[in-house]
Amino acid sequence: AKYLKAIGALRGGQLVEVTRADLVGRYVGHTAPLTNSVIQSALGGVLFIDEAYALYRGGEDSFGLEAIDTLVKGIEDHRDDLVVILAGYTKEMQLFLSANSGLASRFPNQIEFPDYSGEELYKILCSIAKGKGYTLDDACKLPLVTYFDRKQVEDAATNGNGRMARNTLEKAILNQSKRLVADPDASLELLLPGDFELE
């Protein structure tokens, strides 16, 4: 948002990040005002809707459809003063964009980011570990890369890419603390292959 402001594409530099819970009301008549309020707060900046596909849960979801209809109108009415970014998994986003005939045409630019490779996830895990004060034994690399590659093939959509790396590290840190109870002289910073649960 700041870069778009810097080049003059937007008058404001704010980023408003929301999910379904921020756009869909719990009662009849609450969704449109809620969605309009979010749009108003983003004017001049960027509205980022994470997991946007959650707005559409099928034809029976009248609240979600109302939020989508309100968004479409808001996007059209403020097309010169608002950038809207929708994020989500490819398959779910395709279904979402078909929920309203005007929705897909308002998002002509679609960018699909490929899933991380096992090597990239390993580097992400190492970076997170370093930020927490941990290092990985060199023997961790091959099993972790192999594990991440296998998990990505099985189902990248539910693994969450970077989230999978973080969760794997958090389990390893917990396992390391259990190991240190039995071996208090071991390094507090070093994670070993046995600390990782690579089912």
Question: Which positions does each model-derived feature cover?
Answer:
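C-terminal helical "lid" subdomain and adjoining coupling/linker elements of P-loop NTPases
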Residues: 136, 151-199
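Conserved C-terminal "switch" segment of AAA+ ATPases
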Residues: 7-10, 95-98, 104, 113-158, ...
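Conserved catalytic/switch belt of AAA+ P-loop NTPases
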Residues: 53-104
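Flexible beta-alpha connector loops of hexameric P-loop NTPases
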Residues: 20-31, 54-65, 110-114
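Conserved nucleotide-binding/hydrolysis micro-motifs of P-loop NTPases
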Residues: 22-24, 53-55, 89-94, 115-121
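Walker A/P-loop
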Residues: 1-13, 37-43, 107
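Conserved alpha-helical scaffold flanking the Walker A/P-loop in AAA+ ATPase domains
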Residues: 7, 26-49, 68-77
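Conserved post-Walker A coupling segment in P-loop NTPases
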Residues: 4-28
